[in-house]
């Protein structure tokens, strides 16, 4: 069998895939001895997604030889949503062109997902000269995006030495969420210079769907530069988004 991968906690893995599937229709997953990785760009080429899951976060990880498999993300998401929090998730691939997805809990349930041909693009995650780094709780970011969606289709991030502000302005109303390090929701703030940039709310909303309320989210950005959003999965795995800015006229 080319590979067998076991992850304890099917729902956590499902949330991860659901977040990526909000932005991309299909993806090429690289399965190597080191772990599972995927890098893709949404069809409009506004956001890049980078997923890295080292073998150490899995309870069992056996790979005979490196392989890249193409997956329809919507179909994968729908199957994974059938898993429960306490279910063990088992991903297997034999010699046939199927991914076998098994949930072990009160019963053993197995799905077979046909693999597809996906064009592998050479995508780089660039090192950018960000001037602001913000670490905050997932709940704070998710609620700010919901608040902002009531008044605008873009959300402005403003980082100063001692405060981080998220602001949205509509034709008739506006909303502002302000945080300092005295607030429980802001965990860290590093600012080289006052930094301002705006981003599309629809993309931000998709990017945070799989983030838990207590998860730590790291934002890195510069003035009118892309936003890099990172959050960790079991300390060592990481999901990264790189979102193009909404340049204001």
From Swiss-Prot:
What residue ranges carry the coiled-coil annotation? none
- Tell whether DNA-binding is among the UniProt keywords: yes
An annotated Gene Ontology molecular function: DNA polymerase processivity factor activity
Name any Gene Ontology BP term.
Answer: leading strand elongation
Q: Which UniProt keywords apply?
A: DNA replication, DNA-binding
Q: InterPro entries this protein is in?
A: DNA_clamp_sf, Pr_cel_nuc_antig, Pr_cel_nuc_antig_C, Pr_cel_nuc_antig_CS, Pr_cel_nuc_antig_N
Keyword Amino-acid biosynthesis included in the entry's annotation? no
**Family annotation (NCBIfam families):** pcna (TIGR00590), PRK01115.1-2 (NF002219), PRK01115.1-4 (NF002221)
Q: What does this protein do?
A: Sliding clamp subunit that acts as a moving platform for DNA processing. Responsible for tethering the catalytic subunit of DNA polymerase and other proteins to DNA during high-speed replication.
Name the protein family: Belongs to the PCNA family.
* HAMAP family, per the entry: DNApol_clamp_arch
Q: Cite the record's note on assembly.
A: Homotrimer. The subunits circularize to form a toroid; DNA passes through its center. Replication factor C (RFC) is required to load the toroid on the DNA.
Q: Report what the protein is called.
A: DNA polymerase sliding clamp
| Species of the source | Thermococcus gammatolerans (strain DSM 15229 / JCM 11827 / EJ3)
Gene field: pcn
């Amino acid at each position: 069998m080319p590979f067998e991968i076991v992850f304890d906690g099917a729902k956590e893995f499902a949330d991860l895939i659901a977040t990526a599937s909000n932005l991309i229709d299909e993806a090429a997953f690289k399965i190597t001895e080191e772990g599972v990785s995927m890098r893709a760009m949404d069809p409009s080429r506004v956001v890049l997604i980078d997923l890295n899951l080292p073998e150490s976060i899995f309870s069992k990880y056996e790979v005979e030889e490196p392989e890249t498999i193409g997956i329809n993300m919507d179909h994968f998401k729908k199957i994974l949503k059938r898993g429960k929090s306490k279910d063990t998730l088992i991903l297997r691939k034999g010699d046939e062109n199927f991914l076998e997805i098994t949930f072990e809990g009160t019963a053993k349930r197995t799905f077979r997902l046909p693999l597809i041909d996906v064009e592998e693009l050479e995508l780089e995650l660039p090192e950018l000269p960000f001037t602001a780094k913000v670490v905050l709780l997932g709940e704070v970011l998710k609620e700010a995006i919901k608040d902002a969606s009531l008044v605008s289709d873009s959300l402005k991030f403003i980082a100063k030495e001692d405060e981080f502000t998220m602001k949205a302005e509509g034709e008739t109303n506006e909303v502002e969420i302000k945080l300092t390090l005295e607030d429980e929701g802001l965990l860290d703030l590093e600012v080289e210079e006052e930094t301002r940039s705006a981003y599309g709310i629809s993309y931000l909303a998709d990017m945070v769907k799989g983030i838990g309320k207590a998860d730590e989210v790291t934002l890195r950005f510069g003035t009118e530069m892309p936003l890099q959003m990172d959050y960790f999965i079991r300390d060592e795995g990481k999901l990264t988004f790189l979102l193009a800015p909404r340049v204001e006229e």
